[in-house]
Amino acid sequence: MIEHKQNYDRQMQELIASLSSEKRTFNLLLHSCCAPCSSSVILKLAPFFKLTVFYYNPNIDTDEEYTKRAEEQKHLISIYNEENLSSHKIEIIKEAYDPQEFYEISQGLEDCPEGGERCMRCYLLRLKKTAERAKKDGFDFFT
């Protein structure tokens, strides 16, 4: 039996094409766990949206590591802004580091394998916070 998987790239391209008839640029809040993971997504989305990167990751082990990754994210964005990838400057929002949020949702799941229930709860936590921030700040889209 052939399993039909979602082609999210094609769905994204179709959405972008459907927006092209609009006479405005849409604002998109992009959650980022780190600069390397967001690099290709930013390249793909920047020509079509006014991007703001949302750096929020309470699952990071220490404040030092959280700050280091946030600084790398800022550095990547500054490079992209210098290269004028978009007609709009890419912005960043760095949420305060609060690992307690992660500890609360992962309590009792310490022995779960990578990619298991603990990870699913962490994804939900971060995307829910991204959605809340997008709504609060009036973004058209979030991802």
Regions found by a protein language model. Give the residues of each.
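ATP-dependent adenylation/nucleotidyltransferase module used to activate substrates
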Residues: H4-T143
